[in-house]
Amino acid sequence: MPKMKTHSGAKKRFKLTGTGKLKRQQANRRHYLEHKSSRLTRRLAGDKLVFKGDAKVIKKMLGV
């Protein structure tokens, strides 16, 4: 059986923490920030953890 390939899109979007959880960036903070409030852009600043159910699928894509 051949090796599983890592999903390139998932590889770019998610990072694995030391404890095995997955980190992701929030959407809506790339461009067109002029019309978005400062409050919103600050709120979207930090990374978030991926929910358990989603993490299972993403880990499979990453080959973890």
From Swiss-Prot:
Lineage top rank: taxon: Bacteria
A GO BP entry: translation
Lineage of source species: Bacteria, Bacillati, Actinomycetota, Actinomycetes, Micrococcales
UniProt source species: Paenarthrobacter aurescens (strain TC1)
Keywords: Ribonucleoprotein, Ribosomal protein
Keyword Ribonucleoprotein: yes
A GO CC term attached to the entry: cytosolic large ribosomal subunit
Pfam families with a match to the protein in the record: Ribosomal_L35p
Annotated GO MF terms: structural constituent of ribosome
PANTHER family listed in its UniProt record: 54S RIBOSOMAL PROTEIN BL35M, LARGE RIBOSOMAL SUBUNIT PROTEIN BL35M
Region (Disordered) residue spans: 1-31
Family from the record: Belongs to the bacterial ribosomal protein bL35 family.
This protein's record includes keyword Ribonucleoprotein: yes
Protein name according to UniProt: Large ribosomal subunit protein bL35
